[in-house]
């Protein structure tokens, strides 16, 4: 998606440890018009008429997933990273390693809101190694739901997470795949 790549070129930064900082428009301060364009782009790739829920992980994927869900006319569900007192029923859970936070976290989804009748589109703002998305896939499988696809706004292609999903046969679309990121800027792979 050329518009997204241009925003990354113009406003993105690379921090030590290959951290790609796009928080000025994607995952801290959010450009909602850009997210609408991203949702429209995903709708060109995925059959949104089949989807019954959009799933993401807490926290920075929530804004994009919400706009996608609103456009597709379905609920948005996010996996929590901590159990709260307001979850009464059983939980689906998956333990994953967070690249950003450098620690293991447990993704939690209430069994009340995800079941075998659901057709799920996983949406996330960012993918590095793909562990968080794999945790969401595991939760979908545990629920017996049908995974319709995975949509990622920005993928760090040099970390291999997206390549694993492409090889898996799961419908997968990343809109901006960063092949290289350094002090000289960004190089994108054909998405």
Features from the language model and the residues they span:
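Short Gly/Thr/Asp-enriched flexible loops that form oxyanion-binding sites at enzyme active sites
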Residues: 63-72
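Active-site/ligand-binding-proximal alpha/beta "capping" segment
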Residues: 124-142
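Active-site-facing substrate-recognition patch
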Residues: 1-51
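Conserved acidic residues
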Residues: 52, 118, 148
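A generic structural signal for well-ordered alpha-helical segments
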Residues: 46, 68-69, 140, 165
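Short glycine-rich phosphate-binding loop at a beta-alpha junction
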Residues: 51-58
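PRPP-dependent phosphoribosyltransferase catalytic core
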Residues: 2, 6-7, 18, 137-191
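Short, glycine/charge-rich flexible loops or terminal/linker lids adjacent to PRPP-binding catalytic cores
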Residues: 74-120, 186-189
